[in-house]
């Protein structure tokens, strides 16, 4: 695979290899055949980041080869959304001959939605001033004249200039209902929107008929919490990043959901609060004991669950675990399988043509 060519003819083979690999990794814990969810074969990534290479009067997007570290020119990127590809061409055309906008520009980040909105961030090794803002506003207006629904942001050391806003609102059809998700620049969002829809619908399916409340750790902008709220009496969710918490609160209101409570704290801190080890001012007014959480949902970072959180989640009858790293999932399962068994197993091809796998398990108490 090269940045400008996807081996789409190999899609089925690479997916089949992942299924075999996941089954092998999960063999000590389950003999289930994974439920498999396919990605679009191209234009599946909703965000992308590129370094900018200055070559005389020219400049262009590049990425670095992971093995050789050599730079690769990228003029089109079929893994990314069609809107990102349009913007890549338009941004280079708009910046190349503009001394103010191109000077010390070293990176451009793109974030897009299925609803055809975009945030483009330009990163600089220089101070950004009023002249930069004026030129950036002219570029934004020129892009919009091309029917590109785009918001521009300038970033430099300790500086962020959002010309209009630093977010876009995604609209996803999830099990017959449209979900609105505010996505903030430089915050985590699911990269493959089509797969995100399938993950949300799978999570809804495995939790249908649930009793009691749901606890979610690492909730981000409320991606899963809000979609799953319809299956539970109440949802209690934790997140540490301020922009994500703010987006989650907006999303609760935008989706007219009244049974989700977001707490800004780390999973490790919440574990301490639940165990009565520490009290937190952030929990004032929230009666943790009133929640009857029968199900816990975790979508941890690549490092997986720490040992204290492992112990904490074992107290719940059902564990829904989405993993971007099956190796750490299996490491966690060495502990979790002592008290729980695997009821459902799914593979989501979030990152086609790479070795990365996204998978999920539903665990129930033995």
Swiss-Prot record:
Active site location: 324, 358
Coiled coil regions in record: none
GO biological process terms held by the UniProt record: tRNA methylation
Keyword Nucleotide-binding: no
Record's catalysed reaction(s): uridine(54) in tRNA + S-adenosyl-L-methionine = 5-methyluridine(54) in tRNA + S-adenosyl-L-homocysteine + H(+); uridine(341) in tmRNA + S-adenosyl-L-methionine = 5-methyluridine(341) in tmRNA + S-adenosyl-L-homocysteine + H(+)
PROSITE patterns (UniProt xref): SAM_MT_RNA_M5U (PS51687), TRMA_1 (PS01230), TRMA_2 (PS01231)
Protein's recorded name: tRNA/tmRNA (uracil-C(5))-methyltransferase
Gene: trmA
């Amino acid at each position: 695979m090269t940045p400008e060519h996807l081996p789409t003819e190999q899609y089925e083979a690479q997916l089949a290899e992942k299924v075999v690999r996941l089954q092998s990794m999960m063999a000590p814990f389950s003999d289930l055949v994974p439920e498999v969810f396919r990605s679009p074969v191209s234009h599946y990534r909703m965000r992308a980041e590129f370094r900018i290479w200055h070559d005389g009067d020219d400049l262009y997007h590049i990425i670095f080869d992971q093995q050789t570290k050599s730079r690769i020119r990228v003029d089109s990127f079929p893994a990314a959304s069609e809107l990102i590809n349009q913007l890549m061409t338009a941004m280079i055309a708009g910046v190349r001959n503009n001394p103010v906008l191109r000077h010390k520009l070293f990176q451009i980040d793109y974030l897009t939605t299925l609803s055809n909105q975009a945030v483009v961030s330009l990163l600089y090794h220089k101070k950004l001033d009023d002249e930069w803002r004026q030129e950036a506003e002219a570029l934004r207006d020129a892009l919009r004249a091309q029917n590109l629904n785009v918001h521009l942001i300038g970033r430099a050391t300790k500086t962020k200039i959002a010309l209009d806003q630093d977010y876009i609102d995604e609209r996803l059809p999830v099990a017959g209902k449209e979900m609105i998700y505010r996505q903030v620049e430089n915050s985590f969002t699911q990269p493959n929107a089509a797969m995100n829809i399938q993950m949300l619908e799978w999570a809804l399916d495995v939790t249908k008929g649930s009793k009691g409340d749901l606890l979610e750790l690492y909730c981000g902008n409320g991606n899963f919490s809000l979609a799953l709220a319809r299956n539970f009496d109440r949802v209690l969710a934790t997140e540490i990043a301020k922009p994500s918490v703010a987006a989650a609160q907006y999303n609760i209101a935008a989706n007219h959901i009244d049974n989700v409570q977001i707490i800004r704290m780390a999973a490790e801190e919440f574990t301490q609060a639940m165990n009565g080890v520490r009290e937190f001012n952030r929990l004032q007014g929230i009666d943790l004991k009133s929640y009857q959480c029968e199900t816990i949902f975790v979508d941890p970072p690549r490092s997986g669950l720490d040992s204290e959180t492992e112990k904490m989640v074992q107290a719940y009858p059902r564990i829904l675990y989405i993993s971007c790293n099956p190796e750490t999932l299996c490491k966690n399962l060495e502990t979790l399988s002592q008290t729980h068994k695997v009821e459902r197993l799914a593979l989501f091809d979030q990152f086609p043509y790479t070795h990365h796998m996204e998978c999920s398990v539903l665990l129930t108490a033995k």
